[in-house]
Amino acid sequence: MAKDNKISASHILIMHTESRNSESKLSKEEALKLANKLHVKLKKDLSAFKDLAINHSSCSSAQYGGSLGEFGKGMMVKQFEEAAFALGVNELSEPIETEFGYHLIKRDK
């Protein structure tokens, strides 16, 4: 387990028209299709994560390559937190759906 029950992770958020606080024009199906496409690319080359986050993520963390920094339990929505804490360091999640859209999560520490 991470020290002090905290981990460090990055993510790519693909929002859609049904996402909370969304300005996206992507349908839910289009967003999932894009998330799956990016997931396939990242499974082949995880080092592309930062560039893909900068170019595709709807989150303000995109400018930092998707980095969310360090966070503990209870700081993120449940589905995101469970997926992030289940990952090993430098592992990538499948697309995870939350009220904000689809996330690809990479555990950094």
Where do the PLM segments sit?
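Short beta-strand/turn micro-motifs at beta-sheet edges
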Residues: M1-A2, S93
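Short, solvent-exposed helix-to-loop capping segments enriched in aromatics
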Residues: M75-L87
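Glycine-rich, flexible loop/turn motifs
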Residues: Y64-S67, G88, L92
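Sec-exported extracytoplasmic/periplasmic mature domains
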Residues: H39-S47, I54-S58, F85, V89
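FKBP-type peptidyl-prolyl cis-trans isomerase
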Residues: I7-T17, F49-S57, F80-A83, E94-K109
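Well-structured core secondary-structure elements of compact alpha/beta domains
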Residues: A2-K44, S60-M75, I105-K109
